[in-house]
C-alpha cells in the first residue's frame, strides 16, 4: 500500500480500508448513541480492567462537526489530568483540520484509551459500533485516529527538526530507552494473566514481578535483556516501580538527548505506546518490539526497511544491536529509510489530510442527519493555547524545553509525553487538584526545582 510518491492517495486509501467494515450497513444514530455511553471501558480480562457488557463507568468523547464548527461532549472528569490533555489534543487536531479542509457534518465518538475497547467477540449481531481510537488490534473493532502526539502545535516543531539531528556515525553506538514501568499489570492490580490476547511469545507465566505475569511486563523484559549487553544499551526507568524491582531510577532524557544515540528502542506500556512517531523523527535506527497494538500509520511501516523488529519477548535485543554495530552501512540505510517514512507520511499536513479523509469517509456511512448533541459545547481552541510559536522560537532550545515538559510558548498538551522520556506531569495554571497530586510539576511551572 505504501507509495512514497503519492502519500495523500496512500493515506486516503488507508482511511477507506479502516472504514470498510461499515460500508454496506452504514452507521445509525442509535449506534452512535450506544457507542458513546457503553463502549468506553475495557472488556478484555487478559488485559485488565474487564467491564461486563451492558455496563460502563465512562463515556467516549462525542464530537459534532456542524457547518464547519466544532462541538464536543467531554469524556473527562475534574481529576482526569492525562485524559484532559488527550482530549484537548484531539480537539486541536480536528480544529486544525477544519482550518484547512471543508468537512461535512458528522456526529462521531472517539476513545482516548491506549487500548481498544470493542472486542470482536463481544459484538455478535453483525453491527459493531464504530469507535474511533488511538489503537487497534486484530481482535477489536476500532478505526485508528492519530494519537495526541500529533496535536499540531506539539508535532510541528518536532517534525521541523527532521534532518537537523546529529549524523548517525557521530552518535553514541548504543540503544537508548527511558520511561516508566507502565504495563498491563497495572490494570490487573496484581492478578495473573488469564488469556493469550496480548501475551504471545513471552516467558513463563510463573516468572513474575509484583505478583503479575511476566507476559504483560514488556518493560521489565526490556530492562532484563538490556542488562545482558550493557555495553550496547543505555536503558533505564525514570521512576522506581513495584513491577520492576531491582532497577533504580535514572535521569530522564529529552528528545534532543535521545537523538545523541544511534539506536532507539520502542516497546509497549499499558497497551499501545505513542512514542514511535517521535523516534522516527530523530534520524536514528528504530528497534520496535513486535506488538498486538497498531496505530493509524503502522500498516505502512515495513520491518527491516523502516524499523528493526524485535521479538515480542525482546530476546533478540542484544543480537540485533550487535548486528547493527557490525553492519554500519545497513544501519545508515535503516535510519535514512525511517526519516524518509516520517517525511512522506507523518508531516503535519499529511496527518491533517488523513483526518480529513477519515471524517469524509465516515460522513458517507452516516444513515442519519447529524445534529448537535444536547450536552455539546463549542470548542474554539482558546482553552488549549498559551501562545503560538513563531519561526524564531522554534529552535533546538524550544524542542528541548517542550520535550522536558516545561512551559515554552506551546499548549499544555506539549507535556503529554515529556519528550518520550516520561519525565513527569505538567499542570495547567490554577489546577489546584493537579498541583496537589503532582507538586513537582507545579514547581517546574514556577521555575523552581
Where are these regions (language model features)?
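Secretory-pathway glycan-assembly enzymes, especially type II membrane glycosyltransferases
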Residues: 1-247, 252-253, 409-412, 424-428, ...
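Long, low-complexity intrinsically disordered regions of secretory-pathway proteins
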Residues: 197-204, 398-408, 448-449
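Catalytic binding pocket for nucleotide-activated donors in carbohydrate/polymer assembly enzymes
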Residues: 252-385, 389-391, 405, 409-439, ...
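General helical structural elements
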Residues: 223, 392, 441-449
Amino acid at each position: 500500500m505504501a507509495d512514497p510518491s503519492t502519500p495523500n492517495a496512500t493515506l486516503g486509501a488507508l482511511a477507506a480500508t479502516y472504514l470498510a467494515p461499515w460500508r454496506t450497513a452504514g452507521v445509525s444514530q442509535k449506534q452512535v448513541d450506544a457507542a458513546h455511553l457503553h463502549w468506553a471501558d475495557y472488556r478484555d480480562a487478559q488485559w485488565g480492567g474487564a467491564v461486563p457488557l451492558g455496563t460502563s463507568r465512562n463515556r467516549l468523547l462525542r464530537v459534532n462537526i456542524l457547518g464547519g464548527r466544532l462541538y464536543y461532549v467531554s469524556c473527562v472528569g475534574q481529576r482526569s489530568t492525562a485524559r484532559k490533555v488527550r482530549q484537548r489534543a484531539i480537539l486541536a487536531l480536528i480544529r486544525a483540520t477544519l482550518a484547512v479542509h471543508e468537512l461535512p457534518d458528522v456526529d462521531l465518538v472517539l476513545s482516548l484509551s491506549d487500548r481498544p475497547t470493542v472486542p470482536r467477540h463481544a459484538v455478535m449481531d453483525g453491527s459493531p459500533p464504530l469507535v474511533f481510537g488511538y489503537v487497534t488490534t486484530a481482535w477489536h473493532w476500532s478505526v485508528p485516529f492519530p494519537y495526541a502526539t500529533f496535536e499540531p502545535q506539539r508535532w510541528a516543531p518536532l517534525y521541523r527538526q527532521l534532518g537537523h539531528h546529529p549524523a548517525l556515525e557521530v552518535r553514541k553506538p548504543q540503544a537508548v530507552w527511558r520511561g516508566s514501568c507502565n504495563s498491563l499489570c497495572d490494570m490487573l492490580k496484581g492478578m495473573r494473566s488469564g488469556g493469550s490476547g496480548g501475551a504471545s511469545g513471552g516467558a513463563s507465566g510463573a516468572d513474575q514481578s509484583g505478583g503479575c505475569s511476566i507476559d504483560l511486563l514488556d518493560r521489565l523484559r526490556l530492562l532484563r535483556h538490556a542488562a545482558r549487553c550493557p555495553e550496547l544499551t543505555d536503558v533505564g526507568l525514570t521512576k522506581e516501580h513495584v513491577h520492576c524491582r531491582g532497577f533504580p531510577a535514572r535521569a530522564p532524557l529529552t528528545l534532543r538527548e535521545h537523538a545523541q544515540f544511534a539506536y532507539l528502542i520502542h516497546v509497549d506500556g499499558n497497551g499501545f505506546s505513542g512514542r514511535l512517531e517521535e523516534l522516527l523523527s530523530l534520524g536514528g535506527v528504530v528497534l520496535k518490539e513486535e506488538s498486538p497494538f497498531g496505530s493509524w500509520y503502522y500498516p505502512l511501516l515495513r520491518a527491516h526497511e523502516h524499523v528493526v523488529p524485535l521479538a515480542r519477548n525482546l530476546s533478540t535485543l542484544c543480537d540485533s544491536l550487535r548486528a547493527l554495530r557490525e553492519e554500519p552501512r545497513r544501519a545508515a540505510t535503516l535510519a535514512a529509510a525511517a526519516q524518509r517514512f516520517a517525511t512522506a507520511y507523518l508531516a503535519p499536513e499529511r496527518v491533517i489530510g488523513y483526518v480529513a479523509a477519515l471524517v469524509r469517509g465516515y460522513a458517507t456511512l452516516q444513515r442519519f442527519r447529524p445534529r448537535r448533541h444536547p450536552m455539546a459545547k463549542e470548542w474554539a481552541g482558546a482553552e488549549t493555547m498559551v501562545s503560538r510559536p513563531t519561526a524564531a522560537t522554534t529552535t533546538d532550545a524550544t524542542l528541548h524545553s517542550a520535550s522536558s515538559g516545561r512551559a515554552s510558548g506551546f499548549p499544555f498538551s506539549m507535556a503529554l509525553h515529556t519528550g518520550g522520556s516520561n519525565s513527569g506531569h505538567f499542570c495547567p495554571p490554577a489546577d489546584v487538584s493537579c498541583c496537589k497530586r503532582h507538586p513537582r510539576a507545579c514547581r517546574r511551572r514556577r521555575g523552581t526545582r
